[in-house]
C-alpha cells in the first residue's frame, strides 16, 4: 500500500504543483489503484508515473470545486482510448453524476468500459472482504467529504510445518484449519484451527481530509490512522484567511493529527503563495512543532503505508 501524490497545490496549477489528486496504490493487495480527487491535468501527471489508467478501479471525489474534478473527463476518455475494459466506480457528492454525464455527452466521448457513479452520503460507501471506506461531511462551504480507508485485519498464516510434524497431511482439512475451525481427524484427534495460525496482521488506515476547516469531524475520521493526508492551504499566521475560505492551516492540521492519534501526517493542497524552499520549510516546521511526524507533500512524492 503506497500513496503517490499526483497534485499537491491549491486552487489552480502552479509551476511546481499541480492541482489535487492522490493515488492510493493497492497493487499488492488487489492489483489496482484508487484515486482521491482528480484535478485538471491529473492524467498528464500519471504519464510521469508507472500507473496504468486501466488499473484505476475507483475514484473518490471529496467535493465539486474545479481543482478537484476538472481532470475527470479527460482521464475517463483516455482510459477508454487506451483499451481499458475493467469497470470503474466513482464516488462523490450530489452533482458528480450530472457533471460526468454532461461532460461525456457534450464531447461525444464513448467509454469502452462499465462506469458506475455513486452520489454518496455520510457513512460506509464501499466494503468488501479487504477494505471498508467511510465518508464524513467536512466544513468547506459546499457539500464536501473526507474519506477513511480501512484495511481489514489479515488472518494469520497457517503453520503448515507444525501440522506436518503432527502427521496431518495436506488436504481439504488444511482449509478448515486455516479458517480457525475445530476439526475432528480420521484418527479421532480434535484440532482447534486457531492453535495453528500465526497472529493476524493488523489492517492499515489512511484518512483523507479533503478541503476543510479544522474540524472534530476530521479528527474522528482520522482516529488511529497510519497516515492522515490533510489539507494545509495556509500558514499558521494566515489562520483568519483559512477560516474565511473554509480551509485549514499547517498548525491546525497538526493539531488534528495529534488529537486523532494518527501515526503520520502528510500536508497537501498548499497555496501558491508559499513558493520556494524556505517558505515550505517554514510550513513544515509549523506542523512539526505540534506533531513531529509531519511532512509537506510535493508532486510525485511516494509514501509507503507501513503496518503497525
UniProtKB/Swiss-Prot annotation:
<feature type="binding site">
    <location>
        <position position="211"/>
    </location>
    <ligand>
        <name>Zn(2+) 2</name>
    </ligand>
</feature>
<keyword id="KW-0378">Hydrolase</keyword>
<comment type="similarity">
    <text>Belongs to the RNase Z family.</text>
</comment>
<keyword id="KW-0819">tRNA processing</keyword>
<feature type="active site" description="Proton acceptor">
    <location>
        <position position="67"/>
    </location>
</feature>
<keyword id="KW-0862">Zinc</keyword>
<feature type="binding site">
    <location>
        <position position="269"/>
    </location>
    <ligand>
        <name>Zn(2+) 2</name>
    </ligand>
</feature>
<protein>
    <recommendedName>
        <fullName>Ribonuclease Z</fullName>
        <ecNumber>3.1.26.11</ecNumber>
    </recommendedName>
</protein>
<dbReference type="GO" id="GO:0008270">
    <property type="term" value="F:zinc ion binding"/>
</dbReference>
<dbReference type="InterPro" id="IPR001279">
    <property type="entry name" value="Metallo-B-lactamas"/>
</dbReference>
<feature type="binding site">
    <location>
        <position position="140"/>
    </location>
    <ligand>
        <name>Zn(2+) 1</name>
    </ligand>
</feature>
<keyword id="KW-0540">Nuclease</keyword>
<comment type="function">
    <text>Zinc phosphodiesterase, which displays some tRNA 3'-processing endonuclease activity. Probably involved in tRNA maturation, by removing a 3'-trailer from precursor tRNA.</text>
</comment>
<feature type="binding site">
    <location>
        <position position="67"/>
    </location>
    <ligand>
        <name>Zn(2+) 2</name>
    </ligand>
</feature>
<keyword id="KW-0255">Endonuclease</keyword>
<dbReference type="InterPro" id="IPR036866">
    <property type="entry name" value="RibonucZ/Hydroxyglut_hydro"/>
</dbReference>
<feature type="binding site">
    <location>
        <position position="68"/>
    </location>
    <ligand>
        <name>Zn(2+) 2</name>
    </ligand>
</feature>
<dbReference type="Pfam" id="PF12706">
    <property type="entry name" value="Lactamase_B_2"/>
</dbReference>
<comment type="subunit">
    <text>Homodimer.</text>
</comment>
<keyword id="KW-0479">Metal-binding</keyword>
<feature type="binding site">
    <location>
        <position position="63"/>
    </location>
    <ligand>
        <name>Zn(2+) 1</name>
    </ligand>
</feature>
<feature type="binding site">
    <location>
        <position position="65"/>
    </location>
    <ligand>
        <name>Zn(2+) 1</name>
    </ligand>
</feature>
<feature type="binding site">
    <location>
        <position position="211"/>
    </location>
    <ligand>
        <name>Zn(2+) 1</name>
    </ligand>
</feature>
<dbReference type="InterPro" id="IPR013471">
    <property type="entry name" value="RNase_Z/BN"/>
</dbReference>
<dbReference type="GO" id="GO:0042781">
    <property type="term" value="F:3'-tRNA processing endoribonuclease activity"/>
</dbReference>
Amino acid at each position: 500500500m503506497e500513496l503517490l501524490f499526483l497534485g499537491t497545490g491549491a486552487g489552480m496549477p502552479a509551476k511546481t504543483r499541480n492541482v489535487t489528486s492522490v493515488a492510493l496504490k493497492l497493487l499488492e493487495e488487489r492489483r489496482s489503484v484508487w484515486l482521491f480527487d482528480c484535478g485538471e491535468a491529473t492524467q498528464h501527471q500519471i504519464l510521469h508515473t508507472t500507473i496504468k489508467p486501466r488499473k484505476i478501479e475507483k475514484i473518490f471525489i471529496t467535493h465539486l470545486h474545479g481543482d478537484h474534478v476538472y481532470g475527470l473527463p479527460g482521464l475517463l476518455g483516455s482510459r477508454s482510448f487506451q483499451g481499458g475494459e475493467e469497470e470503474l466506480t466513482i464516488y462523490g457528492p450530489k452533482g458528480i453524476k450530472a457533471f460526468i454525464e454532461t461532460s461525456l455527452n457534450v464531447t461525444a466521448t464513448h467509454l469502452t468500459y462499465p462506469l458506475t457513479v455513486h452520489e454518496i452520503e455520510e457513512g460506509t460507501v464501499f466494503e468488501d472482504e479487504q477494505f471498508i471506506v467511510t465518508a464524513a461531511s467536512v466544513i468547506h462551504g459546499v457539500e464536501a467529504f473526507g474519506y477513511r480507508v480501512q484495511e481489514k485485519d489479515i488472518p494469520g498464516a497457517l503453520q503448515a510445518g507444525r501440522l506436518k510434524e503432527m502427521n496431518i497431511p495436506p488436504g481439504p482439512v488444511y482449509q478448515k484449519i486455516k479458517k480457525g475451525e475445530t476439526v475432528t481427524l480420521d484418527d479421532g484427534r480434535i484440532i482447534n484451527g486457531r492453535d495453528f495460525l500465526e497472529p493476524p496482521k493488523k489492517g492499515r488506515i489512511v484518512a483523507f481530509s479533503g478541503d476543510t476547516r479544522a474540524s472534530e469531524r476530521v479528527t474522528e475520521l482520522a482516529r488511529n490512522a497510519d497516515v492522515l493526508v490533510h489539507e494545509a492551504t495556509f500558514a499558521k499566521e494566515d489562520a483568519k484567511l483559512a477560516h474565511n475560505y473554509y480551509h485549514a492551516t499547517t498548525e491546525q492540521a497538526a493539531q488534528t493529527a495529534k488529537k486523532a492519534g494518527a501515526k503520520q501526517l502528510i500536508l497537501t493542497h498548499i497555496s501558491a503563495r508559499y513558493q520556494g524552499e524556505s517558505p515550505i520549510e517554514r510550513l513544515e516546521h509549523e506542523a512539526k512543532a505540534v506533531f513531529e511526524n509531519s511532512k509537506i507533500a510535493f508532486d510525485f512524492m511516494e509514501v509507503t503505508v507501513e503496518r503497525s
